[in-house]
Amino acid sequence: MDLLNNAITSFEPTAQEENETWVYYSIGKKLKKQGWKIHISSQMTDALIIFEKVSKLLLQEKCNFKVAKNSTVLAEINSPRNDTSTANKFITIYPNNCKEARHLIIKLNDLLKDYQGPQIMSDFQLGINSPIHYRYGGFQARRVFNQEKNKIIHMIEDDKGNLVEDVRGSTPYTPNWVVPLFSEEEKDYYFSNKKETIYNSKLQNYHFISILKKTNRGNVYRAVKKDTEQPVIIKQARPFVGNSNDEKWMAINELKNEKMMLQEFLDKSYTANYVDDFYLEGNYFLVQTEISGKNFFEIALRNGVSTKQKEQYIQNIVQIINELHREGYLLVDLSPTNFIYKENGQVSLIDLENISNEKAPVRRVQTPGMLNQDTDLSIANIQQDYFALGMVAIAILIGHVLPVSKGDGKLNLSSMQKVMLVIDLAVESDDLTPYQSSWIKIVLKMSESTQTSQNIPMLLEDRSESLPSTLSNHSFSYDFHKEIIEITNDLLNRTVDKHGRIAKSSEFGEFISPLSIQHGLAGYIVMINKFYHGRSEKIKNLITQVNEVNNLLAPFEYENSLLFGRSGYLWSLITTFETSTDPDYLFFCEQIVQNLMEQYKNEKCVDFALGKAGILLSLMKYSSVIEDVQVDLFIKENIEEIFNSFSTISVNNLMEYAFAHGKAGLAYVLNCYSRIYKDDIYDDAINSFSDFIADVIRKQLLTGFDKLKSLDYFWCEGFSGLILYLCLVKQEKYQLLLIKAQNELFKQHLNMGTSYCHGLASLLQTIAYTENKELYNKIVIILLTRSYRDSNDYLVFQSECPSQSVFDFGTGTFGIYWTILKEKFLFSLDRKSKR
């Protein structure tokens, strides 16, 4: 029983909301945009009593706050490996003003004086190990997308009303226009905030060179011992950081275990040597010798590492594991990042904090991609080491970890079977040799044996035996139509939240309009309308709710665009009107069309995804269904601008002739215009460009697809988009070229994600045109290896972050279903009889 969750759900002030992480309580005044916020951290064992004390005080003081919704969420927040801005933030309090913030902090300091908590690095901490922290920052989400950094930036207003970054770093920060909440003298008086100086500690014996890694547990530093000039690695463990329910295994315990292992392995040539350890302000530091060489990411990115050298790495890893197993140790948390790789093929074992004695095995870490998720992961055993070794070998040979999900009983597809299928496809794509494949399978099969200990065979011993492929003899039993109907039925019965959403999206998805086809309602409507007929009233009710909320929201970036805004929303409503003939949908469409035409001249982009070309395409979709002279005239008056942009774009790289943001998308819109209005004015330019794209693909086939960046493979900015363009415009002419390109591009499937815009589904979309049946089956197999049952027992797929799934059409589960079910390009456009 989760006592914390029970306490949270039974605490019922007005206007309670929740999402998958937080429960929000609106007790006080309307939430301000920004100000001094208070964060409370907590050890797992203290969380219940701290919540009860703090919530009672905040109810009395009429102050808004949010809290981690249950113990599972708090364990994730408190994880030593949490590297997000949520680390250790159990409760967040939103005071109405500076005076109230000071008042609450002083009261909380007295209320929680008997408790200690982990440090929140972005905040000022009231005293050493105090659970109370504070910082100046945003209360309401205001974000912009920084194209240079390719990430979402949180914003606040400065004293002049300008938006500036809400800095959330690893040290406390107060904007220069904000008066500190407490002076240094007040901090000393109220909070006994005196700290040890490093000059009284052993830290002064070292010269720090760089920070190698930052995590909630603590930093890892490269340093030099001053008296001997010896290069060392210094690892830090912060006090009270951990998600153990009994506090017996915290970050410090973990690092102390590494110290013990270093001392026990003193006679081994493949580990670092213990140098020293000490405390400072409750932080524990472990010093060990630095091992020279490359880390896994460095060798994965290097093209010069030969197959022979990779096999030598694996050979030496096997020798290390066999030796440790013979001596009674389990590695427990084995991954390719646990080794330093040297030019001569030797490896050194690092990060020993989870190695344990086989007589007292404990698993506290579950590194993604290294475990058979169908087994009991609460314990550690030698079989799990075998499985992890097989996955490590794959990672070294192909350059990254396999993103395989847990098994699916309904599909009769175990996690082990998924791995075996991916291995066989890797052999077909020349990523693994048949012998490497067989050896890896032998090691993986050892993980299913009941033998307590086995000697792992060496990779280079016998190359004569090859195990058969499992591709031809495995059959799947699934009904994707049934699966998608279950999901869409659920969405139809959900309520709309205050952000205009019925399901979570990615961080970027929640930054743009909830109406969008890429990350929001329009994508859901497309799927519901396509696969769940006869629910027009429910769809209309959902649309009405979202429209009401959306009218209250601030403007979004690209809010009129095809992928991120109203144009895509219009497309989804037109398709719904086509199937239902309900005049209410026509009314919705007419309103959007009018807005798009009125605001068209203000659009800065011209491209397919974000700009004028996509907007015109959505108006063409409307025009293909509804007789509207005004819309036809508007399209004809503005199409020349698209052609001028198409004609003047200089093509210097792949992105500039790609579909979403380049010439291919513009050419497709021009081609749709020609077909809709039976006007051949642009045909010569389109034909010439199509021949050019075909030549680009031919040249790439000669050099291969293996040296490209990941985005170069996909619909949005890469070759899947170019293949799709030719499928849409000149398929018959280029059919043989298209099939050849599809087959060669698929060989890079291990470098590709899953999604419609940035993954394998974008390649699968092209097969709806070429009917490349053999390749269709292979892509579906790969996608199924990256699928799993969520908490509602729905079959979902990994999204852009392999550990998560969203329903989004562009980057989530819906776009994948669309292509698996062999639907044509979502933005296909044909001339139809008008109503």
Give the ranges of each region predicted by the language model:
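ATP-binding glycine-rich phosphate-binding loop
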Residues: 7-21, 183-227
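ATP-binding glycine-rich loop module of kinase domains
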Residues: 36-44, 209-211, 216-256
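Activation segment signature within eukaryotic-like protein kinase domains
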Residues: 313-314
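Catalytic-loop of the protein kinase fold
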Residues: 325-342
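C-lobe/activation-segment region of protein kinase-like
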Residues: 355-425
